[in-house]
Amino acid sequence: MSDSDGKNMEGRFEAAYIVDLVRLILERLSFVDFHRARCVSSTWYVASKSVIGVTNPTTPWIILFPNKNVENNGSCKLFDPHENKTYIIRDLGFDMSTSRCLASSGSWFLMFDHRADFHLLNLFTRERILLPSLESIDGERYMRFKRPISGSHIEIDKAVLWVDDKSRDYFVFCNLSSYVAYHHKRGDDNNSWKVLQPIKHQGCVDMVFKESKLYMISAHQCLTVFDFSGGVSPVEMECASFGSSVCVNRFHMKYFSNLAVTLSGEVLIIVGGKMDSSPEAKCVFTVNKMDPKSSEFTVLIKSIGDEALLLDLGITVPAKDGVMRDCIYFSNDQYHRCCGISLRDGYNADRICVYQIGSDYVVQEFEHLTTSSTKLFKDARWFFPTFGDKCCFHLWILHPVILQAKKLQKSNLKGTKPVTREKTTIVNNVDGTTTQREKTTKGKNMIGKK
């Protein structure tokens, strides 16, 4: 065996040893830290592939967003009801207290900051995508947005997000005053917003995007479905109305209407509210489906069977692996989100709950998440954490165990031949800075900031 063959074999053994070492560290981490650590570098990402038993959660989680005047405004709180575990996600590099979460898709969140800028934020990888400005929309003249008296943010009544975890393609829909604007990124096509022309000047009450179709309730109380499977230009498919046929008389407090699409593609209208004005009054819901004869939502249903409904996502999911059947997972309504009312504030204190449709009763509450915390939370959402095959490698403040492992990995690399790789640049920061992988040299990290 030649010297070069011996060195190559030795290098392969050392590389395998490092991967094994990293895998042992990854197996000790919590679920959240595991998915944070897998994006440290390509070595950690490869090692994470061989860790057994780490999969996407089968039950929805709760995310809580901090209110203003908190010490660590770059953090948020996660709660896994199935495992009864709480996680604090810190150092997001994003001011969560002065921003609003408008929608989510998997682990991606559509954030709207105080400067009226949109961002897509992945909680676990810290990846961030800045969306185009709203000042000009597809040739439209500058739109006059409705602002609160404080002038702190633009009022957006409703938004929807869909992200493909593998390709990073996405759709974003927003209701801006009487417009519904949307932005679609596929490949390198990522430069503008467009107005949904068929419903221009109508506005919307709620909308859901599922399987390339946008389901939308307009302010005129009509349901319209648009098919985006052909690309950016939608095709209007069908229309129905619900109007006064949906029962709201049972609610004495302000009620709200939501749209949901079941596993079979059936559209539901959900109306919720409180029976009286007392703080002790619980949320109640009415669920209606369409009458095929009249094309109106006049059929009151008492059960959705072996499915569960997540109002924040506007979809139903199979009731299995810990997901409760015939239930509505509810967190907050659009009125309180827009007003920024604290989740610990009187009427809003018990918003996070699971409501069983058949029994017409709240079967699970999560008041302890807010009342036991010294930090005020302005909003909460149900979401399904998902982790795609891609990772955007970053430098951030790491878990102490990860830091210790990286030091050990670095010490084991001493004396090995440096590896040279081509420089690649990934733009992912709001301020225009770039995260890039530099050519490596002995004893130096592969990732740096320019």
Swiss-Prot record:
One of its GO terms (cellular component) is cytoplasm. Keywords: Brassinosteroid signaling pathway, Cytoplasm, Nucleus, Ubl conjugation pathway. InterPro entries: F-box-like_dom_sf (IPR036047), F-box_BR-signaling (IPR050942), F-box_dom (IPR001810), KIB1-4_b-propeller (IPR005174). Transmembrane segments: none annotated. Disruption phenotype: Abolished brassinosteroid (BR)-induced ASK7/BIN2/SK21 degradation, and BR-insensitivity. Suppression of the constitutive BR-response phenotype in the dominant mutant bzr1-1D, and accumulation of phosphorylated BZR1. It comes from the Eukaryota. The keyword Metal-binding does not apply. Pfam families: Beta-prop_KIB1-4 (PF03478), F-box (PF00646). One of its GO terms (biological process) is brassinosteroid mediated signaling pathway. Its main location: cytoplasm. It is found in: Cytoplasm; Nucleus, Nucleolus. Component of SCF(ASK-cullin-F-box) E3 ubiquitin ligase complexes, which may mediate the ubiquitination and subsequent proteasomal degradation of target proteins. Required for brassinosteroid (BR) signal transduction. Mediates ASK7/BIN2/SK21 inactivation both by competing with substrate binding (e.g. BZR1) and by promoting its ubiquitination and subsequent proteasomal degradation. PANTHER family: F-BOX PROTEIN KIB2-RELATED (PTHR44259:SF15), OS07G0183000 PROTEIN-RELATED (PTHR44259). This is F-box protein KIB3. It comes from Arabidopsis thaliana.
